C-alpha cells in the first residue's frame, strides 16, 4: 500500500544541497531506531527509483532496495509505503526489505481477524494439488481439501475453478505458512437455511423433483435441493425390483412423492410407485382365488419361485406348493427361468401386496388316489427304497414313499436289530396303518401282519388288577418279577413302598412272593409294570372307608387290625 504525500518529505537527491544533506544526516543520527526490528512491517519513504529497484528509507542508517516486481502499482519518489524488514544490515551493509511480505503480513492479519469472527473470505481456485486444490486469497495461497469442495462429488472440477467465490477459513498456521479453507461449509450453511425453510413446508402427499444422490442395496437417497429423502426399494415400483440400480442412475432427475415425514427425526420417506394408481386395488378382482392360469418363471428364492401374472406383476409359488410328493422341493431342480407353467391362485393379499400361487394343485394328488385304492388295513407289497436308523422307506409308485418305523417291524424283537436283515430293492409285505393327506405321510407296519401276542396278556392283566408275583431278579432300579410263571413284570424302586426308607430293592429276595397292583402294560414288549405302593395306598383307603369310626376315636392300627382279621 502506498500513500502519496502532498509535500515531499525528501526532495530528489539531485536537488538536495550540501547544507541540507548535513542537516538531514544529523537528524538521522538523532532518530531513535530502537523500535525498528527485523521480521516486522514498518513504513518507509521512496527516495529513488533506479533501474529495476525502488530505494526506500525506513529511518535506518542504510536504505533498502526492493525489486519493482514486488509492487502491483509502481510508487513514485516521495511516496510512503509499508515494507517488511528481512534484515536491518545485510552482507553489503544495506537493509534488506520486502514489499511482497509486507502485503502478505497485512493480509494475514486481516484473515486472522475474519477467521476469529467466522466471516467468509473471497478467493479463487487456481490449481490442483495432491488431496485438493490451491486457492488465491488476494495474494495469500490457501489449501482446499477435496472433502471440503462440495456437499456431493463434483464430476468436473474445472467448472468451479478460476471463479471468485466465498470460502470459510478452517485453520491458520503462520509458522508453517498454511491456511486451510472450505467451500463446502459455505454451501452447507446456505443449504441449512434452505433446509429449515423446506422442512417447515413439507407435507405427506407432496410431489417433488429431486436428484439421485446415492444408491444402496435397500434403496436410494434423493437430493431434494436442500434436504435428502430415502426412496426405499419397495417404494420404487409396484412390480418387483431386485436392486435400485435396475431402474435408477446416479444424478438422475426423478419425480417423487412424500409418503412419510417424521417431524421429530426430520426423516423423509419417498416413493415413486405412489405416483401411479395402486394396481392391487383391482388385482383381487382380476385374479380370483381358484383361477387357473399359465405364466413364465421369472425368479427363484430359497422359499419358492416367482411367476409373472402379467407385465409388472408377479406371484409366489411356495416350495411346499410345487409338488405333492416333496414338501420343500428345490424349485431349481424342476423349473427354469422363462419356463411356462400352469398354476392356480390361492390367495391375494392386498395389504402385503402378495399373490400366493400353487402348481401342485393344478394336478391330482396321488396320495388321495392311493388312499382310495389302499385304505387303512390294506396289505401291500412294495420295494424298499431306502433304509435309515429309524426305519424303512418303501416305494409306493408315482414317486411316493411310505415308512415302516423300526418299532413296527416285530412284536418281540428290537426293530433296530432287524433293520440289518433288510436290503435296498427287496420287496417287503406290509400293512397300511395310517394315511395323512395334509402331511403327505403313509405309515406302514410289518408286525401288524400277525396278531399281537401281548393282547391276551393285556386282556387278562388289566390296569388296577391286584396280582401276586414271584421275584426273579433284584436290580438297583427295581425288581424283575414273573406272573403265573409265564408273564414278565417289573416293579420300579420308587413303587416298592409308600415309605421312602423302604424303597430298597435289596430288602427283597429272589423267589419271594410279592403282592402288587397292575399300573400299565408295555404293549410293544408285553411287560407288566407293577406297584406295591399303589396297592398299599388302595388298601389303606379301602380300610378307612369300611372300618373307620365317625367319632375319630379309632386309630389306624385298629382299622388295619380289623381289616386283617376279616381277611382271615
From Swiss-Prot:
Which SMART domains does the record associate with it?
Answer: S1
Q: Which CDD domains match?
A: S1_RPS1_repeat_ec1_hs1 (cd05687), S1_RPS1_repeat_ec2_hs2 (cd04465), S1_RPS1_repeat_ec3 (cd05688)
Q: The S1 motif domain covers which part of the protein?
A: 39-100, 118-184, 205-273, 290-360, 377-447, 464-533
Cellular component terms (Gene Ontology): cytosolic small ribosomal subunit
InterPro entries in alphabetical order:
NA-bd_OB-fold, Ribos_protein_bS1-like, Ribosomal_bS1, Ribosomal_protein_S1-like, S1_domain
The GO terms describing molecular function are: mRNA binding; structural constituent of ribosome
Residue ranges spanning the membrane: these are none
Could you list this entry's UniProt keywords, alphabetically sorted.
Repeat, Ribonucleoprotein, Ribosomal protein, RNA-binding
GO biological process: any one?
translation
**Family annotation (Pfam families):** S1
Protein family membership: Belongs to the bacterial ribosomal protein bS1 family.
* NCBIfam families linked: PRK06299.1-2, rpsA
The record's function comment reads: Binds mRNA; thus facilitating recognition of the initiation point. It is needed to translate mRNA with a short Shine-Dalgarno (SD) purine-rich sequence.
Name of the featured protein: Small ribosomal subunit protein bS1
UniProt source species: Rickettsia felis (strain ATCC VR-1525 / URRWXCal2)
The gene that this protein is the product of is rpsA
Amino acid at each position: 500500500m502506498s500513500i502519496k504525500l502532498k509535500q515531499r518529505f525528501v526532495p530528489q537527491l539531485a536537488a538536495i544541497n550540501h547544507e541540507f544533506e548535513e542537516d538531514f544526516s544529523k537528524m538521522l543520527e538523532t532518530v531513535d531506531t530502537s523500535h525498528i526490528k527485523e521480521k516486522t512491517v514498518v513504513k518507509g519513504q521512496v527516495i529513488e527509483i533506479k533501474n529495476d529497484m525502488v530505494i526506500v528509507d525506513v529511518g535506518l542508517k542504510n536504505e533498502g532496495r526492493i525489486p519493482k516486481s514486488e509492487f502491483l502499482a509502481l510508487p513514485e519518489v516521495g511516496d510512503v509505503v509499508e515494507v517488511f524488514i528481512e534484515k536491518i544490515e545485510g552482507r553489503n551493509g544495506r537493509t534488506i526489505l520486502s514489499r511482497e511480505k509486507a502485503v502478505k503480513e497485512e493480509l494475514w492479519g486481516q484473515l486472522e481477524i475474519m477467521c476469529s469472527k467466522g466471516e467468509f473470505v473471497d478467493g479463487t481456485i487456481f490449481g490442483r494439488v495432491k488431496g485438493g486444490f490451491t486457492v488465491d486469497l488476494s495474494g495469500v495461497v490457501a489449501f482446499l481439501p477435496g472433502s471440503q469442495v462440495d456437499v456431493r462429488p463434483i464430476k468436473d472440477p474445472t467448472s468451479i475453478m478460476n471463479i471468485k467465490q466465498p470460502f470459510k477459513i478452517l485453520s491458520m498456521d503462520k509458522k508453517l505458512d498454511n491456511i486451510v479453507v472450505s467451500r463446502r461449509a459455505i454451501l452447507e450453511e446456505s443449504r441449512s437455511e434452505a433446509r429449515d425453510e423446506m422442512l417447515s413446508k413439507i407435507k405427506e402427499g407432496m410431489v417433488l423433483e429431486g436428484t439421485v444422490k446415492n444408491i444402496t442395496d435397500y434403496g436410494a437417497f434423493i437430493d431434494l435441493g436442500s434436504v435428502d429423502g430415502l426412496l426405499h426399494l419397495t417404494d420404487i415400483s409396484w412390480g418387483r425390483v431386485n436392486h435400485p440400480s435396475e431402474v435408477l442412475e446416479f444424478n438422475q432427475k426423478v419425480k417423487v412423492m412424500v409418503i412419510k415425514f417424521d417431524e421429530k427425526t426430520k426423516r423423509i420417506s419417498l416413493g415413486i410407485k405412489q405416483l401411479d394408481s395402486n394396481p392391487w386395488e383391482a388385482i383381487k378382482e382380476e385374479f380370483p382365488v381358484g383361477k387357473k392360469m399359465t405364466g413364465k418363471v421369472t425368479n427363484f428364492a430359497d422359499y419358492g419361485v416367482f411367476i409373472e401374472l402379467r407385465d409388472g406383476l408377479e406371484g409366489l409359488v411356495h416350495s411346499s406348493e410345487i409338488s405333492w410328493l416333496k414338501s420343500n422341493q428345490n424349485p431349481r431342480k424342476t423349473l427354469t427361468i422363462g419356463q411356462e407353467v400352469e398354476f392356480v391362485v390361492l390367495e391375494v393379499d392386498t395389504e402385503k401386496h402378495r399373490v400366493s400361487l400353487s402348481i401342485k394343485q393344478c394336478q391330482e394328488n396321488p396320495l388321495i388316489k392311493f388312499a382310495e385304492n389302499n385304505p387303512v388295513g390294506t396289505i401291500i407289497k412294495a420295494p424298499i427304497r431306502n433304509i435309515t436308523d429309524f426305519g424303512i422307506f418303501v416305494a409306493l409308485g408315482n414317486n411316493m414313499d411310505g415308512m415302516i418305523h423300526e418299532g413296527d417291524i416285530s412284536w418281540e424283537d428290537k426293530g433296530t436289530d432287524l433293520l440289518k436283515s433288510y436290503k435296498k430293492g427287496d420287496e417287503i409285505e406290509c400293512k397300511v396303518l395310517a394315511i395323512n393327506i395334509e402331511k403327505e405321510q403313509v405309515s406302514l407296519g410289518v408286525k401288524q401282519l400277525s396278531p399281537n401276542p401281548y393282547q391276551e396278556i393285556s386282556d387278562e392283566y388289566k390296569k388296577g388288577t391286584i396280582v401276586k408275583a414271584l421275584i426273579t431278579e433284584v436290580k438297583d432300579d427295581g425288581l424283575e418279577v414273573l406272573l403265573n410263571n409265564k408273564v414278565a413284570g417289573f416293579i420300579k424302586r420308587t413303587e416298592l413302598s409308600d415309605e421312602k426308607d423302604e424303597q430298597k430293592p435289596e430288602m427283597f429276595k429272589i423267589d419271594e412272593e410279592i403282592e402288587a397292583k397292575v399300573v400299565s402294560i408295555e404293549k410293544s414288549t408285553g411287560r407288566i409294570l407293577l406297584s406295591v405302593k399303589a396297592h398299599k395306598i388302595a388298601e389303606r383307603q379301602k380300610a378307612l372307608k369300611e372300618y373307620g369310626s365317625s367319632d375319630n376315636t379309632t386309630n389306624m392300627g385298629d382299622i388295619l387290625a380289623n381289616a386283617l382279621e376279616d381277611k382271615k
